[in-house]
Structure formats: C-alpha cells, structure tokens
C-alpha cells in the first residue's frame, strides 16, 4: 500500500530513476535486460530506472552506455580487469566492447591486489634486523636468539626460486662461550663476492676496496652514517655497522621466495623456522643449525651453548635498564606506534643478562631500535641525550 509522498518521508532517487512503491524484484540490468519478464519475486519499494535506461551496477545508464560482460564478470564502461599474473589489461569501452592489451609490471613494481583492484603497484620492502647477542627479527617480525658461532645463511632463495643473491654471516664468541655476535657479512650475486668485515673493511672478490665503490652495474657500496651500505638492482639492500648489527632489506617482489635465518617472508610467522629441506621446526636452535655453511676459513664449534641464566635480581635490573625503550614520554615513544618496541625490549633484557649489565651492550641495543625506527621513517633525533649512552 503506497504510503510515501512528496512531502511525507520522500525517497530521493538518483538521476535517471524514479520512486516506485511496487517495482519489480528483478530489475532490468545491462547483464540481463529481460530479467523482469521471468521474475518470480514479489514487488518491492525502490527506485526504478526510467524507460530506456538499464541498471549498471547501482547506476541507471542509457542502454547504449552499458558495460561489458567478460569472463562471467560485469564491468561498467571505463572499468578494467587485470589477469592473475598481470600480463593482460582489459578495459571496457563503449558499446560493450572489452579491449585487451599486454601488460608488464615495471622493475620496481609487483602484481598484487590493492584497494580491491589487481594491478602493478610499487613494491614495498621488508626488513630483517640482526643485532646484539645475536637477535634476529625476521622479515615477518618473528624474534629468535640463535647463538651459533659458525657461518650461516641469513637469506637466500628457497628450493628452485632463484632470487639471484645469497647473504651469509659469520658469528663469533665474545668474552663468553654463551655469548656470540655477528662478526662479518658476505653477499654473493652475479659473479660477485662482497665481504663486509669488522671496522667496516670491504672486500670484493677477495680484494680490499675503498668506498664508495660500484663493482658491477646496479651494485653500489658506500658509507652512510654509521653503516656500510650495499645497494643492488635485485631488490636487496644491506647495512652493516662493522660490529654486531646488520639490516637486510628486500623488495616485495621476493615475497614467498626466501629462506634462511631471516625467515620466509610469506606474511606469516608460522613458517619462519623452515630448514633447507623444507621442514618447519619448532626449535630455533634446530632451525638455525640447519643453515650452517661449511667455511674452511672460519673454524667453529657447531654445538650451541645455552644462554646465561639471569637471577631475579639481575633480571629486575635488566628490565629497569631496558625500560627506556618502552617508557611513555621517553626518547623512543615517537616510534612506538610505527614499530612496537617489545621485541627490542626483550632482546635488550636478554643481552643485559648475558653480559652482566654491560652499558656498551645496552647502548648497542638502544641504537638498534633507533636504526629500525629510522628505516621505518621515524627520526628520533638525539635519542641518547639523558641516557648513559
């Protein structure tokens, strides 16, 4: 029974439509202009398209401006479709014609869905951070404290996925059999072997080089602040401080293709502890040891020493020292919303226990969080002011 009128609870209808208190439950659309003729649904109140117009999505358009039915999906005029691997772009043109052309993503782009639309978009990056005793924040954000003192693969391609590079690190004991830290880094790619050693010494294919250097097209090595920075055209960047800290940044185009101590970069932490044989294990020591690389120049004991235990008093002191990372109103608060500090706080407490409350190591751990914040786009300024650093 009609109850609305122009002055009582009027229903505003969009252009090219009108209010109908009992319109068909199967309105004519660009996909099915004959829908009302075979409709068994009861009539409904709503906005019906004016004669000569058809429903395209939620808009009434002239029949001549209807879109395209393509691969069982309807597209309005001007809308486009990209296939699953972004090699074809099809656009709905006038008169219902879908016109397709070849598509290729750029070198710094990846094929993905963004805001509901598949296409070629700028590749994001993921960071793996290695520092301290050592601690590994994987590409997917999982923290582990593998204490091996040998040579290990931190990132390489999984199985048959060729990413074109491999990064290994040598660890060594520092002052205690239960304390190890990163000593040097090696990058292998396209016939190059780049070694980043202590005190920021750099070797390319065995020869010591001065910085900046460009040993191959698309590969640059330079000093940037406190780090030796290696940039490659393969979507890999390294930053090594010449002591204990390494930042490994990879392009999104490598997502799902990586393995090593930096994890799998699949978007899930569940498979980060994957061994070279493809088996995911729960124990990080089993996982870490599986990535050991034979190295005649780096004799080591593959046995993993347990970490030093911390007494309640020592743990309380460590928590107090490291709380500056999580303190609201402290120098690191501006970064909290972008990069939660909890894993860095946990690593800091771990290191304070392992080193007997070393001030130097405390400052190393605070600096590691500051470096990660900088990579995330948060500049903390002189964070060390007012601290023991």
Q: Residue locations for each model-derived region?
A:
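Extracellular/secreted glycoprotein ectodomains characterized by long, lumenal stretches
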Residues: 1-389
